Amino acid sequence: MTDTDIKSHKIEFPCNDYPIKVIGDTSVGFTAAVMEVLEKHATVDLKTLAERQSSNGKYTTVQLHIVATGEDQLRDINSALRATGFVHMVL
């Protein structure tokens, strides 16, 4: 991949349809904690909300789209999600 290819894949903000995937331990409060953080930091498209458990039920994935306004916002979301204690990975 060339430098030109990398630059052409850079996200342009605001991005009205930015996908977020959050993976964490399956627990009663996981989805609520994820939603609380996302709704605090961004406009959330609830129509895109999808929740799925792993085959063994140990992990849950929450996916949805947000309005992303910039890299600082995305860093803040990542930090806040990890601070919940539920989250293993944010994609």
Curated annotation (Swiss-Prot):
<dbReference type="InterPro" id="IPR007454">
    <property type="entry name" value="UPF0250_YbeD-like"/>
</dbReference>
<dbReference type="Pfam" id="PF04359">
    <property type="entry name" value="DUF493"/>
</dbReference>
<dbReference type="GO" id="GO:0005829">
    <property type="term" value="C:cytosol"/>
</dbReference>
<dbReference type="InterPro" id="IPR027471">
    <property type="entry name" value="YbeD-like_sf"/>
</dbReference>
<protein>
    <recommendedName>
        <fullName>UPF0250 protein Psyr_4360</fullName>
    </recommendedName>
</protein>
<comment type="similarity">
    <text>Belongs to the UPF0250 family.</text>
</comment>
